[in-house]
């Protein structure tokens, strides 16, 4: 049973744009006994066993979505051109990999603009995926920042909790040296309050 009253939720906010760093942070945090669970774009399953931010090649995307391989390859070429990654177009798209969420959102835009037409079943799958992925992105990422949720087993306040908030911040700083990272939640509020009166 999931009981919200027993969970201590913290939100770790880091610069957006590097799904690999976000996954590494979440993987590292999951190793701590103080962490019950984590949630971020990189550990949300999308479909077919893939996480939202897993990088897929055109072949993998084609197999996952039942999209013709030639259409998937065209789509990846358009994505590469759109992101001015011309070397991938010239060098071959077969090994080019793009995060699943980014490719789905790009495909949705291409369909909306009339560049790609899908059969009804695939269109329905795309519409459902688009709704779920945009909701996840709205909750966990903005233009400048990504948010990762950490559900801790520790109480909201106390020395052990405060030490762990420092650990979480240090882990994030290791992946984003010299950049702003933020940790928010009741524990950090309590910690700041206690430090101000120390």
Tell me the role of every PLM-derived stretch.
Residues 1-81:
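Juxtamembrane segments of multi-pass membrane proteins
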């Amino acid at each position: 049973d999931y009981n919200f009253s027993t969970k201590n939720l913290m939100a770790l906010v880091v610069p957006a744009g590097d799904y690999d760093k976000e996954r590494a942070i979440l993987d590292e945090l999951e190793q701590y006994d103080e962490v019950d669970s984590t949630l971020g774009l990189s550990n949300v399953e999308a479909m077919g066993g893939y996480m939202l931010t897993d990088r897929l090649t055109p072949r993998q995307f084609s197999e996952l979505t039942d999209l013709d391989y030639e259409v998937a390859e065209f789509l990846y070429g358009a994505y590469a051109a759109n992101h001015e990654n011309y070397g991938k177009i010239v060098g071959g798209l077969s090994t080019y990999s793009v995060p699943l969420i980014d490719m789905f959102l790009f495909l949705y835009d291409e369909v909306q603009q009339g560049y790609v037409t899908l059969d009804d079943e695939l269109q329905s799958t795309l519409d459902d995926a688009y709704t779920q992925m945009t909701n996840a992105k709205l909750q966990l990422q903005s233009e400048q920042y990504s948010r990762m949720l950490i559900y801790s087993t520790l109480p909201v306040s106390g020395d052990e909790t405060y030490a762990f908030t420092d650990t979480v911040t240090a882990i994030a700083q290791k992946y984003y040296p010299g950049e702003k990272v933020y940790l928010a939640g009741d524990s950090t509020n309590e910690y700041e309050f206690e430090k101000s009166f120390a």
